[in-house]
Amino acid sequence: MEGPAFSKPLKDKINPWGPLIVLGILIRAGVSVQRDSPHQVFNVTWRVTNLMTGQTANATSLLGTMTDAFPKLYFDLCDLIGNDWDETRLGCRTPGEGKRARTFDLYVCPGHTVPTGCGGPREGYCGKWGCETTGQAYWKPSSSWDLISLKRGNTPKDRGPCYDSSVSSGVQGATPGGRCNPLVLKFTDAGKKASWDAPKVWGLRLYRSTGTDPVTRFSLTRQVLNIGPRVPIGPNPVISDQLPPSRPAQIMLPRPPQPPPPGTASIVPETAPPSQQPGTRDRLLNLVNKAYQALNLTSPDKTQECWLCLVSRPPYYEGVAVLGTNSNHTTLISTIMGLLIILLLLLILLLWTLHS
């Protein structure tokens, strides 16, 4: 009986580049899982830029993960409106003009998502009322979907003109650079979940009861840098030599003293206590105790609800855990999917090896 068509051995039908392809996919999957780790620390820089002048109003850098590096950003209104803003001499060229700018309400409109009728850059994306999502005004503009909130900082209302402390150091209330219109930018919950791969733009306007409200625009940019490879840690040089646990010192019974020769005074010899080197267990307990003392002195509120954990094998890493709620549902699913993909690819590689 003739065999069926295409009855060549299985190994003749397999792509000879199969192992390399599978290996490349495995490496790529491993890199993807490592890159998507929510615990990886980066050097994150947030930058607020005045788009009218190109000047940087704020640049804040910090170390953190992609899910928690969202600090408050502090800058000044004069960093956004500059010296000469419009034809009504509203700006920050003189100390008096800076003080005057403090008397106006301000409102902010997003340029990253522009609703219908809100205009473009010329209107500061505030082409009609209702486009504003945040600010400091009597009608309290707010939004449930915008990425930031921008409010005025704490400035005493009775503070006088905005004098520069480097020029007028003797004037009460003078500040560095004459800045007396502090602003505070905070990230909303939506902003902490948004993608910041590209700059995002907002328009800012000061509210005036008559005339046109002047416009300025600013951008917010995030720059993420890898802090480099991790440096291996350990072993702890203090407890590198392993010793058994300390044992109670053996009590040596003294021998009966020899009677002194006739005519000499009796001298009782002093015996030094036997020296005992602490064992590994003693030093580990001392390490935990010292860590607790340091934690208790620096953050006494944390010692009431935290655990001190010590790995029982070298290099004896020590960790601090605080009780709280946490949810890693999304992270757990992505991790499981990544492991399943790797196991599937390993199975394919194993089958190829068996048939070759």
Swiss-Prot record:
<dbReference type="GO" id="GO:0019062">
    <property type="term" value="P:virion attachment to host cell"/>
</dbReference>
<comment type="function">
    <text>This envelope-like membrane glycoprotein is responsible for ligand-independent activation of the erythropoietin receptor EPOR leading to the abnormally rapid proliferation of erythroid precursor cells. In the first stage of Friend disease, constitutive activation of the EPOR by gp42 causes uncontrolled, polyclonal proliferation of infected erythroblasts, leading to polycythemia (massive increase in the number of mature red cells).</text>
</comment>
<keyword id="KW-0946">Virion</keyword>
<feature type="glycosylation site" description="N-linked (GlcNAc...) asparagine; by host">
    <location>
        <position position="58"/>
    </location>
</feature>
<dbReference type="InterPro" id="IPR008981">
    <property type="entry name" value="FMuLV_rcpt-bd"/>
</dbReference>
<keyword id="KW-1169">Fusion of virus membrane with host cell membrane</keyword>
<keyword id="KW-0732">Signal</keyword>
<dbReference type="GO" id="GO:0019031">
    <property type="term" value="C:viral envelope"/>
</dbReference>
<keyword id="KW-0812">Transmembrane</keyword>
<keyword id="KW-0945">Host-virus interaction</keyword>
<comment type="subunit">
    <text>Homooligomer. Forms heterooligomers with mouse EPOR, probably via their respective transmembrane domains. BB6 deletion mutant does not interact with mouse MST1R isoform sf-Stk.</text>
</comment>
<feature type="topological domain" description="Intravirion">
    <location>
        <begin position="353"/>
        <end position="356"/>
    </location>
</feature>
<keyword id="KW-0472">Membrane</keyword>
<feature type="glycosylation site" description="N-linked (GlcNAc...) asparagine; by host">
    <location>
        <position position="328"/>
    </location>
</feature>
<feature type="glycosylation site" description="N-linked (GlcNAc...) asparagine; by host">
    <location>
        <position position="43"/>
    </location>
</feature>
<keyword id="KW-1032">Host cell membrane</keyword>
<keyword id="KW-0553">Oncogene</keyword>
<feature type="topological domain" description="Virion surface">
    <location>
        <begin position="33"/>
        <end position="331"/>
    </location>
</feature>
<keyword id="KW-1133">Transmembrane helix</keyword>
<feature type="signal peptide">
    <location>
        <begin position="1"/>
        <end position="32"/>
    </location>
</feature>
<dbReference type="GO" id="GO:0055036">
    <property type="term" value="C:virion membrane"/>
</dbReference>
<dbReference type="InterPro" id="IPR018154">
    <property type="entry name" value="TLV/ENV_coat_polyprotein"/>
</dbReference>
<keyword id="KW-1168">Fusion of virus membrane with host membrane</keyword>
<dbReference type="GO" id="GO:0020002">
    <property type="term" value="C:host cell plasma membrane"/>
</dbReference>
<feature type="glycosylation site" description="N-linked (GlcNAc...) asparagine; by host">
    <location>
        <position position="296"/>
    </location>
</feature>
<dbReference type="GO" id="GO:0046718">
    <property type="term" value="P:symbiont entry into host cell"/>
</dbReference>
<feature type="region of interest" description="Disordered">
    <location>
        <begin position="247"/>
        <end position="279"/>
    </location>
</feature>
<keyword id="KW-0261">Viral envelope protein</keyword>
<feature type="short sequence motif" description="CXXC">
    <location>
        <begin position="306"/>
        <end position="309"/>
    </location>
</feature>
<keyword id="KW-1162">Viral penetration into host cytoplasm</keyword>
<keyword id="KW-0325">Glycoprotein</keyword>
<feature type="compositionally biased region" description="Pro residues">
    <location>
        <begin position="254"/>
        <end position="263"/>
    </location>
</feature>
<dbReference type="Pfam" id="PF00429">
    <property type="entry name" value="TLV_coat"/>
</dbReference>
<dbReference type="GO" id="GO:0044167">
    <property type="term" value="C:host cell endoplasmic reticulum membrane"/>
</dbReference>
<keyword id="KW-1161">Viral attachment to host cell</keyword>
<keyword id="KW-1038">Host endoplasmic reticulum</keyword>
<keyword id="KW-1160">Virus entry into host cell</keyword>
<keyword id="KW-1043">Host membrane</keyword>
<dbReference type="GO" id="GO:0019064">
    <property type="term" value="P:fusion of virus membrane with host plasma membrane"/>
</dbReference>
<protein>
    <recommendedName>
        <fullName>Glycoprotein 42</fullName>
    </recommendedName>
</protein>
<dbReference type="GO" id="GO:0016020">
    <property type="term" value="C:membrane"/>
</dbReference>
<feature type="transmembrane region" description="Helical">
    <location>
        <begin position="332"/>
        <end position="352"/>
    </location>
</feature>
